Regions:
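Active-site PLP attachment segment
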Residues: 136, 142-176
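Amphipathic alpha-helix from the class-I
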Residues: 193-213, 224-229
Length: 256
């Protein structure tokens, strides 16, 4: 338990949040987030390309559900207006920080501005950014120099590569989740060796400016090499580099 609290406190400090709560995986974190916080009188507005764990977590809660076309701020505002018109008590906007299939970044500054305008909360799954995006690897909000209300993330990628997930946010939210998030209450805690590895990985991340620079140099080199060979890529700088093949059978053949 001491190791777990040490890692939770370290994650909260690293991410600039009040506190954090650990889960066995980020799938569990996203699955346990929405139901304790949002009821039938509330609304959740989700990006159309959000990760499956966010989609499943939203399905488990009783809030009214709205969806906006991915990164379409005009459509997001339309859904915010609809939620307001439908009498939503509380509204939460949920998005990936980086979309896992194409490496594009959510428009967090614009999302935050709309959230402030309509009195909505913001939730960001930053699994594909924490550890290497933004100053000191603090993720997509830090990359954009903005803030969000709730962050979820994983220990299974840049923060160690084994397993584990977390939710970081305001103290009242984390306190409530400790009492009501079912994947936290009714599942196993992280093994102590994984927790200790997460603490060590976080220290490496905080001191990893040289490694982060090398990662983006490698990604740029790989993008150039693929482009020079005639492959079609989506624009971007993120280490997720989608190759657009345009045909299902060709994609299966390439995967082999």
């Amino acid at each position: 338990a001491d190791l777990h609290r040490e890692l939770e406190s370290a994650l909260a400090r690293f991410l600039g949040m009040d506190d954090a709560i650990l889960f066995a995986a980020c799938f569990d974190a996203n699955g346990g987030l929405f139901e304790p916080l949002l009821g039938p009188d509330d609304a959740i507005i989700s990006d159309a390309l959000n990760h499956a764990s966010i989609i499943d977590g939203i399905r488990l809660c009783k809030a009214k559900r709205y969806r906006y076309a991915t990164s379409d701020m005009e459509d997001l505002e339309t859904q915010l207006k609809a939620a307001k018109s439908d009498g939503a008590r509380h509204i939460m906007i949920a998005t990936d920080g980086v979309f896992s299939m194409d490496g594009t970044l959510a428009k967090l500054p614009e999302i935050k501005a709309l959230a402030d305008q309509y009195g909505a909360l913001t939730m960001v799954d930053d699994c594909h950014a924490t550890g290497f995006m933004g100053p000191k690897g603090q993720g997509t909000p830090a990359h954009f120099n903005t803030s969000v209300d709730i962050l979820t993330g994983t220990l299974g990628k840049a923060l160690g590569g084994a397993l584990g997930g977390y939710i970081a946010g305001p103290q009242p939210v984390i306190d409530l989740l400790r009492q009501r998030a079912r994947p936290y209450l009714f599942s196993n805690a992280l093994p102590p060796m994984i927790t200790a590895a997460g603490i060590a990985a976080l220290k490496l991340v905080e001191e990893g400016d040289i490694l982060r620079a090398r990662l983006f140099e490698n990604a740029a080199h790989w993008r150039k090499g693929l482009t020079d060979q005639g492959f079609t890529l989506l624009d971007g700088e993120h280490p997720i580099i989608p190759v657009m093949l345009g045909e299902a059978q060709l994609a299966q053949d390439m995967a082999r």
